[in-house]
């Protein structure tokens, strides 16, 4: 694969970097992208009409693809109290990918997703309550019969304690044990 990418990062922040916001749009064209096409085993040729919602043989082929998207990130302080420094951190990601030869969506592209974390720093402790939100996926790879998946939200809890040369991390991912699909 050979990829050509155009991207730029725009960075706004306070002079002391106490808060910041970054935006990174990007566009990528890929030559010889390894993608799958539906293959007819009987005729040993590409399928004339795509089979959907059933098993089909796939063959990997070098094709042309394009991806574009936007990554946003930011952080800001909320308060300094007797219980430490509180802040917010966030990420938002959008990616769109298409096979330029077939017009099909690229396989396994993450839908619009975001993370928002409430953070606390206090006497060696670094804690976070994180919310993860993912939009439903409704435009995947038709050639691979990629299934639609519903959107979901998760809550993660993390804590770490640091000493001079050692850090101990704890975490509970998916705190409420919610069923979700990637």
Kindly label every feature range from the protein language model:
Residues 2-57, 66-68, 173, 180:
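Membrane-embedded beta-barrel scaffold of Gram-negative outer-membrane proteins
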Residues 25-30, 47-139:
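Gram-negative outer-membrane beta-barrel transporters
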Residues 29, 36, 135-139, 160-182:
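C-terminal beta-signal and adjacent terminal beta-strands/loops
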Residues 24, 142-148, 155-159:
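Short, glycine/charged-rich beta-strand-loop motifs at protein surfaces that mediate ligand recognition
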Residues 1, 33-40, 95-107, 138-146, ...:
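Outer-membrane beta-barrel translocator domains and adjoining extracellular loop/strand segments
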Residues 3, 15-17, 77-83, 122-125, ...:
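Outer-membrane beta-barrel channels and translocator barrels
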